[in-house]
């Protein structure tokens, strides 16, 4: 049960950080990094801010994943608690994201050095979360990207409606429940970020830090 709650909290955080980053950094996606291709195109067409930030987000994301993979392998070789250490690194980056955003924001120019550094910390945190999900929570649906989850949920719903055998039905229902809960908490994070950012600006990024600390506590128990 602790691992299931951990996944819910990670889904909430991904939705929150992605939405807050988008609102505060001129349309920069921190979790859904490939979405920056779309917003980059819009920035080029309409001449809006954030071209550099969107252009380098994906390379930054990939570099962090490579580093986390290499460090994680080294930690595992030394029989250290890899997942907890990596998760702690994500929480540290979320804290840095919050502190930098509060200190230097708002960012009328999201391509300024301070905005780029702030955005990078958010992207790096979500890159680590993606790696955690793929390596340490592979049995659960993704926590940061909901397109694939939504597709699988629709396919599972169709299969249940048209009818499957008992064994398949049990497996499909369990998977569908897991997927829908992830989508729900991601959407809840998005909604919470929108409301709290409207009220408190970048101070709202304290929420993912608190949630991140909770995930650390849960990971220690599981």
Annotate each language-model stretch with its function.
Residues 1-222:
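Alpha-helical transmembrane segments of multi-pass membrane proteins
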């Amino acid at each position: 049960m602790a691992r299931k709650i951990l996944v819910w909290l990670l889904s909430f955080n991904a939705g929150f950080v992605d939405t807050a980053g988008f609102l505060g950094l001129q349309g920069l996606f921190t979790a859904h990094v490939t979405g920056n291709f779309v917003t980059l195109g819009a920035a080029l067409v309409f001449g809006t801010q954030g071209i550099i930030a969107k252009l380098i987000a994906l390379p930054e994301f990939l570099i962090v994943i490579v580093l986390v993979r290499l460090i994680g392998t080294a930690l595992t070789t030394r029989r250290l608690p890899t997942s907890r250490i990596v998760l702690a690194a994500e929480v540290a980056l979320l804290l840095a994201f919050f502190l930098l955003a509060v200190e230097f924001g708002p960012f009328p120019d999201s391509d300024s050095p301070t905005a780029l550094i702030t955005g990078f910390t958010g992207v790096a945190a979500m890159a680590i979360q993606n790696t955690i999900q793929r390596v340490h929570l592979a049995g659960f649906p993704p926590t940061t990207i909901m397109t694939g989850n939504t597709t699988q949920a629709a396919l599972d719903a169709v299969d249940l409606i048209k009818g499957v055998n008992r064994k398949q039905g049990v497996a499909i229902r369990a998977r569908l429940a897991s997927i829908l809960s992830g989508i729900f908490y991601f959407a809840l994070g998005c909604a919470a970020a929108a409301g709290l950012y409207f009220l408190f600006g970048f101070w709202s990024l304290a929420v993912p830090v608190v949630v991140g600390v909770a995930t650390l506590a849960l990971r220690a128990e599981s």
